[in-house]
């Protein structure tokens, strides 16, 4: 969607302040989304400043093309972090009231739900992005739904990361439908993948790779169980590699137990830095992230599927949430219904046995990953900064 603008060239857009709880060195799709939208907005010509949680001790700041202000808070979704974020926003209300305030994720959104009732923080423009799971959480309780509806009325533009998230949002907050734009994610700017060899030499290890935080919603357990049901000949050369930080739940224990029962190696590689991920992708043959419904959480899109595609890997995933917008069944990967363990095993078996299919899906994945840009998404949400949009 392209925004229309006034022809009065004296009305430049106000500075853009992006406030997020998830930013470097935090890992994950939302942290990437926040950083790349800031980078793209700066590239469009906006004066961008990102407000993010304090760096951990010993971690140096990256060289960003925009300003970064570190706030004295941890950046989780706990009540203390929400209170501290609210205090920071209130303390800087004069700056924010003269700026475009962009909230790209649910952390600071919760603080905004509280501050809106004081009517002291009134940014020149308020822009919001929703990813999926938070939509269900905000709609699940009457007070939260009411507060969110009130805040949405103040937003001039609302973006969602997938058509699935758009439909979910309109289902729960139909009044805001006219404000919605679609802002798909794209590849990280610093990603320069080396394509893997999709047809490993005879006798070589067949590596199945998952890159995701270790969490029930990411489906690592479902992958292990599906791989255990493969024919013995395919399991003989199989390894399953899991990249991702450990969960705070008891999921680690369940995964370790499942891995111990497998007759093939399951390697937990931990939280691998971005600069070392390329080598891991290059050794893999198939990428798998079989997202599962977990409480109110759902996969709204999945940037990591694009990253796997950029490395030329065919994808095995569940047909859930916004995943089909990142992975096209039969074109860039194979999709299976959640809970269909036999179907998941069959998908893995088909790809392991068919190098030509892997090459075809991998090539299509590389093409798909290159077609989306952060600039397009930033343009849809922010518009050009040379004139102020007549919202």
Q: In which residue ranges do the predicted regions lie?
A:
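Glycosyltransferase donor-sugar binding loop
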Residues: 54-56, 239-253
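Short His-centered aromatic/hydrophobic patch
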Residues: 103-109, 130
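Donor nucleotide-sugar binding/catalytic pocket of nucleotide-sugar-dependent glycosyltransferases
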Residues: 128, 150-193
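Conserved donor-binding/catalytic core segment of Leloir-type glycosyltransferases
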Residues: 159, 200-218, 224-228, 241
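Nucleotide-activated donor-binding/catalytic signature segment of Leloir-type glycosyltransferases, i.e.
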Residues: 244, 252-276
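Acidic donor-binding loop of glycosyltransferase active sites
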Residues: 282-297, 313
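Short hydrophobic beta-strand element within catalytic cores of glycosyltransferases
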Residues: 305-310, 314-317, 327
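Conserved acidic donor-binding segment of nucleotide-sugar-dependent glycosyltransferases
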Residues: 329-330, 334-342, 349-356
């Amino acid at each position: 969607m392209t925004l229309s603008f006034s022809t009065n060239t004296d009305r430049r857009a106000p500075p853009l302040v992006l406030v997020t709880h998830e930013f470097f060195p935090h890992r994950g799709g939302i942290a990437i989304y926040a950083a790349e939208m800031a980078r793209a907005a700066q590239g469009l010509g906006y004066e961008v400043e990102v407000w993010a949680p304090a760096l951990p001790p010993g971690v140096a700041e990256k060289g960003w093309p925009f300003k970064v202000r570190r706030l004295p808070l941890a950046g989780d979704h706990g009540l203390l972090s929400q209170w501290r974020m609210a205090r920071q926003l209130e303390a800087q209300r004069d700056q924010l009231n003269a700026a475009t305030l962009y909230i790209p994720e649910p952390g600071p959104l919760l603080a905004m739900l509280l501050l809106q009732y004081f009517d002291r923080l009134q940014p020149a423009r308020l822009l919001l992005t929703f990813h999926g799971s938070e939509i269900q959480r905000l709609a699940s309780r009457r007070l939260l739904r009411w507060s969110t509806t009130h805040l949405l009325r103040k937003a001039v533009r609302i973006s969602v990361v997938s058509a699935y998230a758009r439909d979910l949002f309109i289902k729960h907050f139909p009044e805001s439908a006219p404000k919605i734009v679609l802002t798909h994610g794209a590849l990280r700017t610093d990603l320069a993948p080396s394509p893997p060899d999709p047809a490993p030499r005879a006798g070589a290890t067949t590596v199945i790779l998952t890159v995701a935080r270790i969490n029930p919603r990411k489906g690592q357990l479902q992958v292990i169980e599906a791989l255990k049901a493969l024919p013995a000949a395919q399991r003989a050369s199989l390894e399953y590699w899991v990249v991702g930080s450990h969960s705070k739940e008891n999921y680690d224990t369940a995964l370790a137990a499942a891995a111990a029962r497998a007759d093939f190696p399951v390697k937990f590689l931990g939280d691998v830095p971005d600069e070392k991920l390329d080598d891991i992708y290059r050794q893999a043959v198939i990428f798998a992230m079989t997202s599962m419904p977990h409480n109110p959480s759902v996969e709204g899109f999945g940037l990591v599927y694009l990253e796997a595609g950029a490395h030329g890997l065919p994808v095995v995933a569940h047909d859930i949430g916004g995943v089909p917008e990142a992975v096209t069944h039969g074109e860039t990967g194979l999709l299976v219904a959640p809970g269909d363990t036999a179907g998941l095993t069959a998908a893995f078996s088909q790809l392991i046995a068919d190098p030509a299919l892997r090459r075809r899906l991998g090539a299509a994945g590389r093409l798909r990953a290159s077609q989306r840009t952060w600039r397009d998404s930033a343009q849809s949400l922010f518009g050009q900064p040379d004139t102020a949009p007549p919202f």
